[in-house]
């Protein structure tokens, strides 16, 4: 049995619903460029960071929730008025954050295993 629950969502509305459904739990969210039918993201940094983030999940506390969120296609993401930028202050992908706290890793920080591990293991 997994020590944590993983939820995969696409878009801001699904992300918001997932957060509401897991209210009261510690939530980590990973924001990444959406993948095409072949499973390839338009965001090269996201492709590089994903295995580092996946490895870091070994350090997540029991009972936490990990939300894997695809932010949409590149034109939507680049719009300064998209919901992720306006409502969550997520301004770059990849971004890994502990929801409801100022703790977050942005872009190249998501490639640093020690930082990812630290984010997941802090209480």
From Swiss-Prot:
Residues in Thioredoxin domain copies: 41-123
PTM description: The oxidized protein is reduced by TRXR1.
Catalytic residues (positions): 43 (nucleophile), 46 (nucleophile)
An annotated GO BP: tumor necrosis factor-mediated signaling pathway
Residues under site feature: Contributes to redox potential value: 44-45
Residue ranges crossing the lipid bilayer per the database entry: none
Tissue: Ubiquitously expressed in cell lines.
Record GO terms (molecular function): peroxidase activity; protein-disulfide reductase [NAD(P)H] activity
Gene Ontology annotations for the cellular component aspect, listed alphabetically: cytosol; extracellular exosome
Subunit structure: Interacts with TRXR1 and DYNLL1/DNCL1.
Annotated family: Belongs to the thioredoxin family.
Protein name: Thioredoxin domain-containing protein 17
Organism: Homo sapiens (Human)
Lineage: Eukaryota, Metazoa, Chordata, Craniata, Vertebrata
Gene that encodes it: TXNDC17
